[in-house]
Amino acid sequence: MGLKNLFEKMEPAFHKGGKYEKWYTLFEATYTILYTPGTVTKKDSHVRDALDSKRMMILVWLALFPAMFWGMYNVGGQAILATSHLGSLTDSIANNWHYAFSEAVGATLTADAGWGSKMLLGATYFLPIYLTIFLVGGFWEVVFAMVRKHEINEGFFVTSILLALIVPPTLPLWQAALAATFGVVVAKEVFGGVGKNFMNPALAGRAFLFFAYPAQISGDLVWTAADGFSGATALSQWAQGGQIALKHAVTGQEITWMDAFLGNIPGSIGEVSTLMLMIGAAIIVFARIASWRIIAGVLVGMAATATLFNLIGSETNLLFAMPWYWHLVLGGFALGMFFMATDPVSASFTNKGKWWYGALIGVMCVVIRVANPAYPEGMMLAILFANLFAPIFDYLVVQSNIKRRKAKAA
């Protein structure tokens, strides 16, 4: 008997009145991940598409894999480089289970480590964070689905990996669990669940950590997974000393634009490589999951605002001089632009609204980065701010169309 036949034989027991009725949500989620649902349209439908929401979310999830794998490689590489510089490898193996496990399975943790060893060490940091977020957030998804008696939506595949990619590799697991809980319960389920949340759940979870536990989500101690190592992000370095201050904290070598573009710098796990994020973005834009209008709007808004600050200039604030192409590759700008600003639920729906929504994100990101003396990153707050304005943009566009048609018909 094939697996599909086994599922079909078991299915009646999970429907209403069946022995396992209360577990239908879990049965349906498992079946529809493996196979296309057997449901058919009984009445007129507004949209027909071969790509259902389940496949769409899984495709976005897969599109984040390039950034995820590079993030693991970079985390491991930065950690090995730092421990080699500090001469603390022996202490790290003795006191840090990530290093001890990696060495036990054959990884080389010295300066001549290969890509496999770097990937393995990075995976020991990323995978526990991701699994914690996935399991805790998934638990809340299942609880609310069972209480409301509806299907489990695969949107959490995307939320979980995004949240795991926008945090430092040293984040405590209990804080990852709290972030997942806040993102799923407070930012999504409280407002009715999938399709009804007005803000991005992953960003809401990170914002919760930023305001509740700033020491573990910002500063100089959290970006490199090496005990006792301190190193500022490239954005913080620019804020303190301008472009000339962009130096690798370990080697002292200059950080070039290409280093930042490829992702050879410390930072949140999945936001460092603009190249890998572009590869994933090409997939979801080509599949028409992400709106190119939003991406273009963000880019135009950022470039225009950065250029304006360049023209104004400042002798005391060195971020005024940062060109737009540096804004693109530093911090969380690329990840936010490609995968968070384009969230179809919390973004604007109308075509014109998408342009204004994207432009607002680009403008606010640069304004927060440059004009905020306490925190040189602005993409998270910019997107959450724009989420609040997305319905307003759509309303104004619709009202404008109504007025234009009335005037034309008069």
Curated annotation (Swiss-Prot):
Reaction catalysis annotation: a ubiquinone + n Na(+)(in) + NADH + H(+) = a ubiquinol + n Na(+)(out) + NAD(+)
Topological type in the membrane: Multi-pass membrane protein
EC number annotated for this UniProt entry: 7.2.1.1
UniProt superkingdom: Bacteria
GO biological process terms, semicolon-separated: respiratory electron transport chain; sodium ion transport; transmembrane transport
Top EC class for this record: translocase
Signal peptide bounds: none
Keywords: Cell inner membrane, Cell membrane, Flavoprotein, FMN, Ion transport, Membrane, NAD, Phosphoprotein, Sodium, Sodium transport, Translocase, Transmembrane, Transmembrane helix, Transport, Ubiquinone
A single cellular component GO annotation: plasma membrane
Subcellular location(s) per record: Cell inner membrane
Family: Belongs to the NqrB/RnfD family.
Cross-referenced PANTHER family: ELECTRON TRANSPORT COMPLEX PROTEIN RNFD, NA(+)-TRANSLOCATING NADH-QUINONE REDUCTASE SUBUNIT B
Subunit relationships: Composed of six subunits; NqrA, NqrB, NqrC, NqrD, NqrE and NqrF.
Name used for this protein in its record: Na(+)-translocating NADH-quinone reductase subunit B
